[in-house]
């Protein structure tokens, strides 16, 4: 059996998140989907898996809502559903950053496409000749599986630690074009908004994150795999899963608890 795995997020005003959560839960359960959906006033964040027809029908229904018409979904395949359950949760944020002064609903973070970034990586600088620094917004557990060659990484275990950890390196970034990246784009979007609000106007987000980069241009300039928070453990640049029984067993225990 071929399972379609999806990742998507969208910052958009949702005034009644619980109502939407109930609707998504009903449609997802009927379709037999597995995974997690997070909903907040600021938007939606989805990691879902299922058979092709079920996935296509679900996203066709969701994107018929004008609020989600621009939702960009990233796809990969596996031989099994990498999630044990189907969960829909209402949260204060769709990715926890705990910076109330940062709102993607008010302004979007400027970004760079995968194809443009690949060109910059080949040259080692942006289109204006300014040196390029890749800034990983993920935690150390994720980074251990892979990151962009020569990327700056931070000693954090949670995304909320990003601002404090970055403070020690600000001077090193002042003369560079900084491209922040994460798994699918949601964390680096908030990170870039905060950095720009904090006076760093030379920062961009990688549109679509690492998975979008893999999907569009492959693994050029990237060392290793991209960690994902499910039973696939990590994906290579061809979006193929790594199957590690020890990590899968650990994940299964956390799903049950």
Curated annotation (Swiss-Prot):
Rhodanese domain span: 128-222
List the GO biological process terms. tRNA modification
Signal peptide (from-to): none
Any matching Pfam family? UPF0176_N
Please list the reactions this protein catalyses: uridine(34) in tRNA + AH2 + O2 = 5-hydroxyuridine(34) in tRNA + A + H2O
EC number(s) on file: 1.14.-.-
- InterPro entries in UniProt: Rhodanese-like_dom (IPR001763), Rhodanese-like_dom_sf (IPR036873), TrhO (IPR020936), TRHO_N (IPR040503)
Q: Which residues form the active site?
A: 182 (cysteine persulfide intermediate)
Transmembrane segments in this chain: where? Answer: none
Database matches in SMART domains: RHOD
What UniProt keywords are attached to this protein's entry?
Oxidoreductase, tRNA processing
Instruction: Give GO MF terms, alphabetically.
Output: oxidoreductase activity, acting on paired donors, with incorporation or reduction of molecular oxygen
Q: Which family does it belong to?
A: Belongs to the TrhO family.
- Function (record text): Catalyzes oxygen-dependent 5-hydroxyuridine (ho5U) modification at position 34 in tRNAs.
Protein name according to UniProt? tRNA uridine(34) hydroxylase
Q: Which organism is it from?
A: Xylella fastidiosa (strain Temecula1 / ATCC 700964)
